[in-house]
Regions:
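A conserved beta-strand-loop-helix scaffold within acyl/acetyltransferase catalytic domains
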Residues: 1-28, 33
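Short coil/turn segments at beta-strand junctions that form active-site/ligand-binding loops
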Residues: 5, 62, 93
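Short acidic/polar active-site loop segments enriched in Thr and Asp
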Residues: 26, 62, 85
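A short, internal acetyl-CoA/4′-phosphopantetheine-binding micro-motif in the GNAT/acyltransferase core
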Residues: 33-40, 69
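A conserved short alpha-helix in the GNAT/GCN5 acetyltransferase fold that borders
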Residues: 40, 49-57
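Conserved active-site alpha-helix within GNAT-family acetyltransferase domains
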Residues: 42, 46, 70-89, 96, ...
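Conserved GNAT acetyl-CoA-binding A-motif
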Residues: 57-67
C-alpha cells in the first residue's frame, strides 16, 4: 500500500503553497503541487519543491516523478530547473499533451 504525504508551505501562518506525494517502495510521485499566485515568480516554488525533493530522497526515494500540463510553461520550467527531465508525454483526457518528468 502506498503511503501519502501532504506538504503545506506557510509564511506567518498564511498558506502559500502545497504539494502531495505518493510513496512506493523506492519511488515517489509528486502531485497537486501549487504556489499561490501572489507568491509565484519569487523563488518560493523552487524552494518548496526542493524541500519536498530533499524529504523524499531522505526517505530513500530516488526515482521521483511529477506530471505537468503542457500549457503550464512556468511549472514546466520550474521542474526543469529543479533537475527533472521529460520522461514521456501523453495525451489522455485532453487534446494537448501532458508531460511526465523524472528526477
Amino acid at each position: 500500500m502506498n503511503q501519502r504525504i501532504q506538504y503545506i508551505a506557510m509564511i506567518y501562518k498564511k498558506h502559500i503553497g502545497m504539494g502531495s506525494a505518493s510513496l512506493g517502495n523506492d519511488e515517489a510521485s509528486i502531485f497537486g503541487f501549487e504556489v499561490s499566485p501572489q507568491y509565484q515568480g519569487k523563488g518560493f516554488g523552487r524552494a518548496i519543491l526542493k524541500r519536498i525533493l530533499t524529504d523524499l530522497k531522505n526517505r530513500g526515494r530516488e526515482n521521483i516523478t511529477i506530471e505537468v500540463d503542457s500549457t503550464n510553461k512556468n511549472a514546466f520550467n520550474l521542474y526543469r530547473k529543479c533537475g527533472f527531465e521529460v520522461e514521456t508525454s501523453f495525451d489522455y483526457y485532453r487534446k494537448r499533451p501532458d508531460f511526465l518528468f523524472q528526477s
